[in-house]
Amino acid sequence: MEDKNNDKEKKTDVTFEDDEDNEDLEDNSSKYENDSETDQSDLGDLPGDAVDRDDDIDEPFISQVQWPQSFRETTDSYTIAASPIFGSLRSNPPSFYRASRSNLDVESKAPLLPERHDDSDKASATQSAWSHKGSFAEELPIGGYGCSVIQTIFNAINVMAGVGLLSTPYTVKEAGWASMVILLLFAVICCYTATLMKDCFENKTGIITYPDIGEAAFGKYGRILICMLLYTELYSYCVEFIILEGDNLTGLFPGTSLDLLGFRLDSKHLFGILTALIVLPTVWLKDLRIISYLSAGGVIATALIAVSVFFLGTTGGIGFHHTGQAVKWNGIPFAIGIYGFCYSGHSVFPNIYQSMADKTKFNKAVITCFIICVLLYGGVAIMGYLMFGEATLSQITLNMPQDQFFSKVAQWTTVVSPFTKYALLMNPLARSIEELLPERMSENIWCFLLLRTALVASSVCSAFLIPFFGLMMALIGSLLSILVAIIMPALCFIKIMGNKATRTQMILSSIIVAIGVVSGTLGTYSSVAKIIRNYQ
């Protein structure tokens, strides 16, 4: 009897808590209504020009498409790598998880399209209140919590400076020293488009993520398009990691093979499969915060590789003696794809912006981040090509002599780093697919495991189908990264800002769109043609 009474009390408590949440939402809704009525009544006492200025203020952005609901949560893993007090950005999980109804622990799912209500103002206010409660970035008091400028720079570099560093010397081989001009040009353009995204956030309250920008600019189809681009880009990074592991482990353990049931696996295929088996348990994890902390080592890994290249050239008996052509026109499209890949961190920049304690310093942090990345990419590109010349391979680590200490440091750093990032890249795609499944199926643990296993297996198959690291990177950069980092931010800025943008901003944004379309087309065509040529 006591147990039954306790159960009843628990049920009563849960119901009471739910009622409190509902009352909070209703109170917020009525508060917004009262505030709006007060504002309207006050307008009658104001001069006509003041009324006109109030009419110019945009209404808060409220998403009308509920897919994907998990995008911000799953990409926030990148912004807690250098969070203050090591994870304080997650200090208030209950309100955060209430906002993400797609979480597997939630008992019910929201429809992809919200139901229409007669009282649209009240519904809008309620949704705004719900959005506010679910935004941990808005809950962070300025000056008390949130990332500082240095932490923001660290997080941004952790997102951008990755495996693209390995292929920068190869771009000099393919395109000549003129590729350095493309390196600088794309850095300036991508840095500018990152600041355009900030302007979009500040123009309308309620724009939190990159998909929100797409919807605010072009409606639900804009949101879906950007989501598809982002998820495809994240998935392609996972494919690139499998290729990377196969190539570098083959260099460390040449001649390795396996004969099993009449099938012979060479070293690249064997290590690709082993890599998938190692990362699979990390993809099965529901809480990826530990992995996100480990992924913060990506900045250290990038620095280690750059330092290793320097010391290998100065003390390893290799030297910097090679020279090259000023420009190789046939390789320019390849360089476009590689550097498009290198500077594409825009999918996570919104999360980084929202995590800042002082958002007014976002531009300063982004500019600093891009300057550091230019120095890293440019330094390794120049040193790597001067060391190996026309013998430079698609990954600088494959050129390094096996008997050198700094070669081992760079190679093993390259091998270990992707294991801390693979799950973080695959998780957003897996969560978005779960949102589209029926509720009973998506909440089943076997569905959870099988879906992620299938995604990992498909990434391995894709890596085996296109096992060309450099060409795959150039294709990703030309086809996806240029769209994500150059074309779409500029287009969305033009659409969202409209007459509020200055003439200079509109002209620059239009030029950037044109550059993105031309360079993306050239790079994609060149990459696809070279991949086909490798199969002929």
UniProtKB/Swiss-Prot annotation:
GO CC annotations, alphabetized: membrane; plant-type vacuole
InterPro entries in the cross-refs: AA_transpt_TM (IPR013057)
Membrane topology: Multi-pass membrane protein
Swiss-Prot/TrEMBL GO biological process terms: amino acid transport
Record region (Disordered): 1-68
Compositionally biased tracts (Basic and acidic residues): 1-14
Pfam family, one: Aa_trans
Major place of residence: membrane
Lineage: superkingdom: Eukaryota
Subcellular localization(s) per the UniProt record: Membrane
Compositionally biased tracts (Acidic residues): 15-27
Keywords for this protein: Amino-acid transport, Membrane, Transmembrane, Transmembrane helix, Transport
Transmembrane segments: 146-166, 177-197, 224-244, 265-285, 300-320, 332-352, 366-386, 408-425, 445-465, 468-488, 506-526
The family this protein is said to belong to: Belongs to the amino acid/polyamine transporter 2 family. Amino acid/auxin permease (AAAP) (TC 2.A.18.5) subfamily.
Database matches in PANTHER family: OS05G0424000 PROTEIN-RELATED
UniProt protein name: Amino acid transporter AVT1A
Gene name of the encoded protein: AVT1A
